[in-house]
């Protein structure tokens, strides 16, 4: 599994991956333009990564500066963190998390990753909490 920074050329593949994520997590209509804009925004900031297997993007994560309403502190938080179901037994998630941790460390920011679905939420929380500070 190869994890690398995303480029604008990856936008289409990331978009379709996020459509899979949306199918799993919401019944709401997904905004095509909003999704593409978010992918491009995060990619342009250098905060989007992809995991590839055999030259196919099978996972992606996007982080950007965020701040909760209760503090002025800025951290790097995820807009998405998704591994295609066919690749969830791979090391894609672990490699992406490690890559994002290094990105945040280099930026001098804390990294906050959230669980965006209720499916297997406890397992996902444990994965994100492992070797990361919880907020």
Task: Please place each PLM-identified region on the residue numbering.
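Conserved acyl-CoA
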Residues: 95-110
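Conserved catalytic-core motifs of GNAT/GCN5-like acyltransferases
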Residues: 115-116, 133-135
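Conserved beta-strand-loop-alpha-helix junction that forms the acyl-donor binding cleft
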Residues: 112-124
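A short, internal acetyl-CoA/4′-phosphopantetheine-binding micro-motif in the GNAT/acyltransferase core
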Residues: 79-90
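A conserved beta-turn-beta hairpin within the catalytic core of GNAT-like acetyltransferases
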Residues: 67-78, 135
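Short amphipathic alpha-helix that is part of the acyltransferase structural core
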Residues: 1-30
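Conserved beta-strand in the GNAT
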Residues: 50, 56-65
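A short helix-loop-beta-strand connector motif used in the catalytic cores of GNAT acetyltransferases and
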Residues: 39-50
